[in-house]
């Protein structure tokens, strides 16, 4: 496999989103307090996206298990990163957003770029494989 970096990328992405999701699922109030940000009026507004991060983390581990075969899932991961980055950067530029959200936006932007590179690398690898479908 030429794209040896893809498997570790998705393992890291799985741990990153999984740990972040579990943190916001288990101790959301403490995280908001640490950043001195008022939490939403109901924890479900935080826990639902936290659980989505855990689901995506599982998907990233599945991609890591067989990146070429599960290449189509990379697009869903890229979609997740766009869904977070777009509003975060939009509000950071146009109005205001608590600074606690911006380090994760920059991380997700980095993951988005790497996911795009992985998508193309896996496509080339699949095309070169004699067993490709």
Regions found by a protein language model. Name each.
Residues 15-23, 41-64, 76-86:
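Core segments of alpha-helical transmembrane spans in multipass integral membrane proteins
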Residues 65, 86-103:
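Membrane-helix boundary connector in multi-pass membrane proteins
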Residues 33-43, 72-73, 97-107:
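Non-cytosolic membrane-interface motifs at loop->transmembrane helix junctions
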Residues 3-9, 13-44:
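Membrane-helix boundary elements
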Residues 74-88, 104-115:
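Hydrophobic alpha-helical segments of small multi-pass membrane proteins
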Residues 110-133:
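Membrane-water interface at the C-terminal end of transmembrane alpha helices
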